[in-house]
Amino acid sequence: MPAPHRLYPRSLICLAQALLAWALLAWAPAQASQELTLVGKAAVPDVEIALDGDDWRWLARKRVLTLGVYAPDIPPFDVTYDERYEGLTADYMAIIAHNLGVQAKVLRYPTREQAVGALESGQIDLIGTVNGIEGRLQSLRLSVPYAADHPVLVMPIGARRAPPADLAGQRLAVDANYLPRETLQQAYPQATLHYFPSSEQALAAVAYGQADVFIGDALTTSHLVSQSYFNDVRVVAPAQIVTGGESFGVRADNTRLLRVVNAVLEAIPASERRSLIYRWGLGSSISLDFARPAYSAREQQWMANHPVVKVAVLNLFAPFTLFRTDEQFGGISAAVLQLLQLRTGLDFQIIGVDTVEELIAKLRSGEADMAGALFVNAARESVLSFSRPYVRNGMVIVTRQDPAAPADADHLDGRTIAMVRNSAAIPLLQQRYPQAKVVTADNPTEAMLLVADGQADAVVQTQISASYYVNRYFAGKLRIASALDLPPAEIALATARGQTELISILNKALYSISNDELASIVSRWRGSDGDPRTWYAYRNEIYLLIGLGLLSALLFLSWIVYLRRQIRQRKRAERALNDQLEFMRVLIDGTPNPIYVRDKEGRMLLCNDAYLDTFGVTADAVLGKTIPEANVVGDPALAREMHEFLLTRMSAEREPRFEDRDVTLHGRTRHVYQWTVPYGDSLGELKGIIGGWIDITERAELLRELHDAKESADAANRAKTTFLATMSHEIRTPMNAIIGMLELALLRPADQEPDRQSIQVAYDSARSLLELIGDILDIAKIEAGKFDLAPVRTALRALPEGAIRVFDGLARQKGIELVLKTDIVGVDDVLIDPLRMKQVLSNLVGNAIKFTTEGQVVLTVTARPDGEAAHVQFSVSDTGCGISEADQRQLFKPFSQVGGSAEAGPAPGTGLGLSISRRLVELMGGTLVMRSAPGVGTTVSVDLRLTMVEKSAQATPPAAAAQATPSKPQVSLRVLVVDDHKPNLMLLRQQLDYLGQRVVAADSGEAALALWHEHAFDVVITDCNMPGINGYELARRIRAAEAAPGYGRTRCILFGFTASAQMDEAQRCRAAGMDDCLFKPIGVDALRQRLNEAAARAALPTPPSPQAAAPATHDATPAAFSAESILALTQNDEALIRQLLEELIRTNRADVDQLQKLHQQADWPKVSDMAHRLAGGARVVDAKAMIDTALALEKKAQGQAGPSPEIDGMVRTLAAQSAALETQLRAWLEQRPHQGQP
């Protein structure tokens, strides 16, 4: 045994430690508590209680009873907001304090344990909402129960079966402050317990599939279900636990307090208890008491001065505020405002706004008096005054129905969360999930759309709003994943600061509305129109009901049939004739085609309405009469013929007969399908004939139209075949000359002088081939309806003069006199497309010269004013061989030709010129007429009605403007050239250098744009198809920069440069902001002409012509590989030739390698782009086979989606053609003399 002197100090130390722990335990709750204002029932009842004098004296000294409550709230027992405490427990506490004559004080603690500790330390007198089990575990003395506590089990509405009695295998969700673990494990040992911070979160876990069963007291469960989960869960069974009801708890030694509290509770009548239950929405019905509260004199005066209150609401805040399709205001807030109107007499005028910011601005500016629904938060309370909340609702997480979406709140960190702008929950979310990204939207609908569209991973909303939107608008796309551990959102009315009377009026009116009424309003607006799970949950019952319904219907029908049979048996003799007549009437008159019945003499016995309608007669006109007697066909001879036919039919045949006939009725021929059936009696004796017909005139016409359409389609197919054969002939003819002459030129020794005549033949053939392609494109545009004229002011006299100048040399070569005669009076300038008019005149004059061997060709122009327009006639007459009438009818069809004479043989050309000319003239609103006779000559006249334009000194035809340009100062232009294909870039730069231009080159759109911003350029020529910034985008950016304010340069001329032959390529260039489009390849002369025209349009200095004479060049030389084309493009500059071809060979190698890699990767869009690039390079040397293959590959790859053997072959062919082209080019270079670089 230890010594006494040693035990004494140790005892002191233990005692000191115990006192310190007790002090800390008592101090901690005091520091953590928060004082609340008790808000009980407005009308507190007086009850008779029996207390002795000592108890009353004790209460007089006591003066204050302190009630302890704790977080989280247990609605409807404990409800805290804005430092106020209300609920069922608050109501009873108010009754106790009132009847005991003491003041009630409420302290709120963060946890139940701290509240119990404060009770044990004497800081509070009693604690509320304690059931019997909790009281025994915490050694408390409990008052008599003031509310029943019946634990119930809750499951999702979609659950098909009730849970097993022992909840075996079930996930049981429970409030951590409700029942202790030992009690639950004893009642349900095989269930898996899941504790949650509050009953609301535990119930949400069941609603959203995170738990199977919820257990809670009946009152709290009923309140939460009606407020938030009406369409999600349901009570399925009572729990196997007895708690003893909800009571007040006091310290075990405070018997006096327990006695006086029990005295009050026992004295409260049952009617008052029911009233309190109904007040919190827990009764069986909703109160209809709309009596107005007692308003103060100031409040009544305010309502008298403001009979109309303007209420601002959000347009999209469903289900709280919304506007229906008929513009009617609806939602929870609308229903609350209706109740407030009954309790205040105020008239609420609704003002819809789009955002919360706009709503608050209207409140602060006075445009609105109050807000109909707004979330309560601290930030808004600094500028607004809020009423008592009429909806309190938990926050939930809404995600997509996607396995990758966040499953619950624990998976939100690092995700993108959508929130309504300025939501009070944003700071809390950012604090809890620091790695999450918050994006904001103006309203809940937009926030939901962000998640549905994949721009956010989750949205945080109140459970009511989330359920409303998901069920109505995002079913199958979004889902409510779980509840969020955040303070419940509070929806309240709000006013601007200073509206003291209004906010007081609203609060009083809201307090007069029972929570039962508010719960009913919320229930009407939650959930969707129909739960999609209902069918699957109750399909067996529905099938059973349908089966029972069908069985009942079948029994009912059987009974009806039985009764009708009895009736028919009794009245058969009476109704037999009526039934027969009714049957005949329905059978005959119900048929839409004519039907008749005649006796064996041909008299009409019966006919239907369709028969009478066909002939336009009544039944009296035909019944009992033969066809000649009634004469309904209008032709006596035809009537007799038809009558004889029927008699013969009845006497000769007894079998049904069906046939097609053409009949004429009242002058109209109809094609009918007629049938006749002789009929007899039961003995087989002939009684007459039944007949009718079906009018198949429309069907016959459709068949004829179908036949005609087939003939037309066959003719079109034959025309297509003819076109292809003609095109093959027309293309092969010049190609034969081109290839043959070039082959002979290649076979000549390298040192031998080239045969100029052979080259001239090839050149002429190429020009004819180019004209053929141009004509075909014109025909295609006209037939597609995409051919547009460009009428401009034009000097009328300049049109024929230009045509005469063009063909003067050709006429002299043939020894033909070409004469221009003009008879123009009072007409100067007209509005016309000069290019297309010159095309027409050129075709007509060219044809006249072509078919005239001697004599003359006369172009006559006659013009006279006709009002504001001018009547103009162009006439081309020749002394040629003439054309017969038959040939003239064929001549204006495409590809139609006639020979000029037997000696001349077949005429050269494609036969498209006259066809195009006539169509162009018709597009201009004129006519083209030919008059000719064999041996006399031909005259072709074009008659037009053109708008006259007032003569202007500045009016100059385009051709004259181009010719007048050289008179301007000879100053070179600053030209920016852009092309990612180095051979094309080098060639175009050399051509521009040759023309004396100042050239800056760029090999990409990005580099070109940078150069353009740094330097001023007069002209920009850009390739249309480039990686990165292509030509179209470059043009758009340049034009946008020029249009910007403060841009100080002159607008530059912008040309597109492309190898594409699409008809709409020029239109695409102009749409992008370009002035025009150049097509590869382009010769020096053509390039000079386009620059001259551009300089004239933009009033730029005209580019000078080169000092050294250069050979004529052409835009294209259609041959497989043309040395002449290379010489023309480079102006026979040996150094440039070698530089160009070496760069082309190197670039083609790289492009082919890249093409093969892209082909292996099946990157079809890039394969198409690379094929277009190779086609552009091949055009430099007119490698036609390679161009054709590249263009075919480009087109095929554009729409390709998978592997293609055809593309595989094209890629191999293109690689082989590139290698062959390289071999041929190097061989050609070896044959040429070597020169040094210039």
Swiss-Prot record:
The modification Phosphohistidine is found at residues 729, 1172. The modification 4-aspartylphosphate is found at residue 1023. It is a multi-pass membrane protein. Residues 726-948 form the Histidine kinase domain. It is an enzyme of class 2 (transferase). Residues 33-307, 564-1238 are cytoplasmic. Its EC number is 2.7.13.3. Pfam families: HATPase_c, HisKA, Hpt, PAS, Response_reg, SBP_bac_3. Residues 332-541 are periplasmic. It catalyses: ATP + protein L-histidine = ADP + protein N-phospho-L-histidine. InterPro entries: BvgS-like_periplasmic1 (IPR049870), BvgS-like_periplasmic2 (IPR049871), CheY-like_superfamily (IPR011006), HATPase_C_sf (IPR036890), His_kinase_dom (IPR005467), HisK_dim/P_dom (IPR003661), HisK_dim/P_sf (IPR036097), HPT_dom_sf (IPR036641). It is found in: Cell inner membrane. GO terms for biological process: regulation of DNA-templated transcription. Residues 1-30 form the signal peptide. Keywords: ATP-binding, Cell inner membrane, Cell membrane, Kinase, Membrane, Nucleotide-binding, Phosphoprotein, Signal, Transferase, Transmembrane, Transmembrane helix, Two-component regulatory system, Virulence. Member of the two-component regulatory system BvgS/BvgA. Phosphorylates BvgA via a four-step phosphorelay in response to environmental signals. This is Virulence sensor protein BvgS. It comes from Bordetella bronchiseptica (strain ATCC BAA-588 / NCTC 13252 / RB50). The gene is bvgS.
